[in-house]
């Protein structure tokens, strides 16, 4: 019995000092960064546009329907997917990104939404600029997030 306890103690202390267990190496930095950068689910809201009477571009977290409606209007179109995405502000909030009016075809695409490890969220998007248009457009992106994912939201553009 004493021999079994001594062998177990030797195995445990060897695990802690070498960082290896049965030929598997544990990289503590990789484990820490993986747990702090947790993917947060979201969905892109379709069928919304930045209202033309908005003075300040809406960028960031919007938790209340009245604040959302002050900046965005609905744009229903024909077809099965023509209705704007439903947003339940009792259980969800949105992250909005918008750019100044342009005469270039411009798409804002979500890249990721992750926890930052300090109780906040980081939303990353990219801008795809295309051909010159004969009219102006206001690029915007709205994503819907469950309210169980709380915290300050930082927005970053992928270059």
Model-found features: residue ranges?
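Sec-dependent bacterial lipoprotein signal peptides
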Residues: 1-13
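Exposed, flexible binding/inhibitory loops of compact, secreted disulfide-stabilized domains
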Residues: 15-159
